[in-house]
C-alpha cells in the first residue's frame, strides 16, 4: 500500500478536525450532557422526595382520620351516655311527681271523706236532737242542745 500525499493530507485534515472538535465542539456538548444529567438526577431525587412526602402525608392523614373517628366515637358514646342519664333523671322525676300527685289525691280524698263524715255526724246529731224534741214535746235550750250534739258526735 502506498502512502501518498492525499492520504497524509487527509490524515492532517482529520487530525485538525478532531482537534477542533475536541477544543470547540466537544466541551459545550459535554456541558449540555452533564447539565441534562444533573437536571434528570435532581428531578428523580425531587420525585423520590415527593413520593416519600406523599407517603408520609398519607400516613399522617390516615392517623388523623383514625384519631378523628375515635374522637367522634367517644363523642357519640358520651352523648348516648348523657342521653341515657337525662332519660333516667326524667323518668325518676316523673315517677316522683306521679307519687306526689297520687299521694295528694289520696290526701284530698281522705280530707273530703273526713269533712263529709263530720258533716254527716253533725246532721245526724241535729236530726237526733230534733227527733228528741218532738218526742219530749218541748224545746231544750241552746246550751243543752250543743251538749247533746257534742256527746253524740263524740260517740259516733
Curated annotation (Swiss-Prot):
CDD domains: ATP-synt_Fo_b
Pfam families (UniProt xref): ATP-synt_B
UniProt main location, coarse: membrane
GO molecular function: proton-transporting ATP synthase activity, rotational mechanism; proton-transporting ATPase activity, rotational mechanism
Compartments it resides in: Cell inner membrane
Transmembrane segments: 11-31
Gene3D superfamilies: F1F0 ATP synthase subunit B, membrane domain (1.20.5.620)
The keyword Transport belongs to this UniProt entry's keyword annotation: yes
Keywords: ATP synthesis, Cell inner membrane, Cell membrane, CF(0), Hydrogen ion transport, Ion transport, Membrane, Transmembrane, Transmembrane helix, Transport
Membrane topology: Single-pass membrane protein
Cellular compartments per GO CC: plasma membrane; proton-transporting ATP synthase complex
NCBIfam families for this protein: ATP_synt_b (TIGR01144), PRK05759.1-2 (NF004411), PRK05759.1-4 (NF004413)
Protein role: F(1)F(0) ATP synthase produces ATP from ADP in the presence of a proton or sodium gradient. F-type ATPases consist of two structural domains, F(1) containing the extramembraneous catalytic core and F(0) containing the membrane proton channel, linked together by a central stalk and a peripheral stalk. During catalysis, ATP synthesis in the catalytic domain of F(1) is coupled via a rotary mechanism of the central stalk subunits to proton translocation.
Assembly and binders: F-type ATPases have 2 components, F(1) - the catalytic core - and F(0) - the membrane proton channel. F(1) has five subunits: alpha(3), beta(3), gamma(1), delta(1), epsilon(1). F(0) has three main subunits: a(1), b(2) and c(10-14). The alpha and beta chains form an alternating ring which encloses part of the gamma chain. F(1) is attached to F(0) by a central stalk formed by the gamma and epsilon chains, while a peripheral stalk is formed by the delta and b chains.
Similarity comment: Belongs to the ATPase B chain family.
Protein name listed in UniProt: ATP synthase subunit b
Gene: atpF
Amino acid at each position: 500500500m502506498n502512502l501518498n500525499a492525499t492520504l497524509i493530507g487527509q490524515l492532517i485534515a482529520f487530525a485538525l478536525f478532531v482537534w477542533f472538535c475536541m477544543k470547540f465542539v466537544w466541551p459545550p456538548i459535554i456541558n449540555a450532557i452533564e447539565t441534562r444529567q444533573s437536571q434528570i438526577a435532581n428531578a428523580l431525587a425531587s420525585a423520590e422526595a415527593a413520593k416519600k412526602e406523599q407517603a408520609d402525608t398519607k400516613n399522617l392523614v390516615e392517623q388523623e382520620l383514625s384519631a378523628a373517628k375515635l374522637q367522634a366515637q367517644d363523642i357519640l358514646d358520651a352523648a348516648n351516655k348523657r342521653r341515657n342519664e337525662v332519660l333516667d333523671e326524667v323518668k325518676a322525676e316523673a315517677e316522683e311527681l306521679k307519687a306526689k300527685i297520687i299521694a295528694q289525691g289520696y290526701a284530698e280524698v281522705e280530707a273530703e271523706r273526713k269533712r263529709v263524715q263530720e258533716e254527716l255526724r253533725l246532721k245526724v246529731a241535729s236530726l237526733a236532737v230534733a227527733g228528741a224534741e218532738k218526742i219530749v214535746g218541748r224545746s231544750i235550750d241552746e246550751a243543752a242542745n250543743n251538749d247533746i250534739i257534742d256527746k253524740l258526735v263524740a260517740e259516733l
